């Protein structure tokens, strides 16, 4: 279904990203997650799709809020493996989630449809043809469905220097914290 590869599947990059996301005072934890959750409708009994679901953190939050089922897509095999592992730990969720390795540009190939809510957290900046993605999202949503997404402001990553960049052994910038 997919011939693209993800930078997150590189061992060092994935390890650095996991470290970054485990920070309890990160932008994701103190701003983005609470804001995203506040914008969502009541999730009880709803079917949700999370585009660029990463390690499944948002999927777990949706299931904890009584979503009937959640579907996550991501390009990264490593991210999806971690999501599967973490969601399986919560035994009561095991039959209520599905994960697909699929780039957002191929959303039309996702076999599932008729979602009440579609979300995406800090992932749309990877998309070249955003209008085409919005058409595919509209085709996957139920009538009057909801799209909620977050997007990094370019100012957060425009500075080339500074201590906020995670760097690999070659001193290349790989993630911003």
Language-model features, listed with the residues they occupy:
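Class I SAM-dependent methyltransferase SAM/SAH-binding core
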Residues: 49-51, 55-107
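Conserved class I S-adenosyl-L-methionine
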Residues: 1-43, 57-61, 82, 146-177
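Short catalytic micro-motifs in class I SAM-dependent methyltransferases
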Residues: 122-125
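Nucleotide donor/acceptor-binding cores
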Residues: 45-47
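A short, aliphatic-rich alpha-helical micro-motif
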Residues: 42-43, 112, 134
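A short glycine-rich, Lys/Arg-flanked "PGG" loop and its adjoining helix->strand segment in the class I
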Residues: 131-146
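A short acidic, Gly/Pro-enriched loop at the edge of an enzyme's catalytic core
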Residues: 109-118
């Amino acid at each position: 279904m997919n011939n693209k590869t993800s930078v997150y599947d590189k061992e060092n990059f994935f390890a650095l990203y996991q470290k970054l996301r485990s920070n309890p005072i990160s932008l994701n934890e103190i701003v983005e997650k609470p804001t995203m959750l506040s914008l969502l409708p009541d999730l009880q009994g709803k079917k949700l799709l999370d585009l660029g679901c990463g390690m499944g953190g948002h999927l777990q939050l949706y299931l904890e809020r009584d979503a009937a089922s959640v579907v996550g897509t991501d390009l990264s095999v490593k991210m999806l493996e971690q999501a599967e592992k973490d969601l399986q730990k919560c035994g009561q969720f095991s039959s209520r989630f599905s994960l697909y390795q699929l780039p957002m540009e191929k959303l039309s190939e996702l076999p599932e449809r008729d979602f009440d809510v579609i979300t995406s957290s800090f992932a749309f900046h990877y998309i070249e043809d955003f209008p085409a993605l919005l058409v595919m999202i509209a085709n996957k949503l139920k009538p009057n469905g909801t799209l909620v997404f977050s997007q990094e402001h370019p100012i957060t990553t425009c500075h080339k220097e500074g201590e906020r960049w995670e760097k690999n052994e070659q001193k290349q910038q790989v993630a911003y914290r």
